[in-house]
Amino acid sequence: MTKNKKILIVTECFYPEEFKINDVALSWKDKGYHVDVLTLAPTYPLGKVFPGYKNGFFRKDEYQGVNIFRVHAVTGYRDSTVKKTFKYINFMIFGSIVAIFIGRRYDYVFGFNLGSLTDMLPAVVIRKLYKKPTMFWVQDVWPDSVYAYGFKKTKMLSTLLDAFVKFMHHNITAVAISSKGFESKLEPYIKKGLKFNYAPNWADDLDMDMVPIALSKNQKIHFTFAGNVGKVQNLENIINAFCLLPDGYQKKSQLNIIGDGSNLIFLKKLSNNNPNIIFHGKQKREDMAKFYKAS
């Protein structure tokens, strides 16, 4: 890349939602690139539009010198499979419409493939129409994640998904993966000659001098999970395993779950009010060092 070039980031989530792509955008901007973002109105993880934002068809705002183009977001997807399905389709359609009008002005397109691969279609539209260099940074692998969310693997669905995934990955010029294990999963779908770039997620630069938070009144061994509380995280197995511990060990231990997501209500019911399993909810990123140091 050359400085002063224009980069469009296509992503389902962006500030004020907390993901690594926020840091990437600011880093490129600080290096002299002109960075714009095409995304949705912010709703993650609660499925509701953040206070101070409106859910219009097309809106503009700005984050520390990065221009943001936002399109309408589906809300209420945490509690409805139908709405979750519409959520997958929504950005694919509205984002692609906007991409047709703004795509020509950019030198590079960078797709932050956080979840659904359908969210990367606006990037592919720009590639097809304007032949711009286009890269995906893959955080979640399709079609595997579709089945992991509970969709039954039928011959028809498998055929459709395989064709879609292959179409998407045959219309990019570069691909980065956040886990080396993704390479074998994606290899059947990428075009010949396309090399994998390994770009793992990194640890936050936290203030480790912060005083640890008191996670319990009594001295205990603390086990802590922090992140998205969804179905694919398989936290039910962790809770079930913790509940199988003898009472003596449980009283000396505490399982802390930090975060929010679509599976939170189910996991709270599963814990059955176990006093040694504590759900702390979503916490600020800058406060996480206090939890880590106490664990």
What are these regions (language model features)?
Residues 265-289:
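Nucleotide-activated donor-binding/catalytic signature segment of Leloir-type glycosyltransferases, i.e.
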Residues 1-64, 174, 243:
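N-terminal subdomain of nucleotide-sugar transferases
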Residues 33, 187, 197-198, 202-220, ...:
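Acidic anion/phosphate-binding donor-loop and adjacent secondary structure
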Residues 12, 76-83, 130-166:
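Acceptor-binding helix/loop patch of EC 2.4 sugar-transfer enzymes
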Residues 203, 215-243, 256:
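Conserved donor-binding/catalytic core segment of Leloir-type glycosyltransferases
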Residues 18, 85-98, 108-139, 143-144:
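An aromatic- and histidine-rich active-site surface loop
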Residues 41, 181, 199-202:
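Carbohydrate-associated surface elements
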Residues 24, 100, 118, 125-130, ...:
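Membrane-proximal helix-turn-helix segments that form the acceptor-binding/catalytic region
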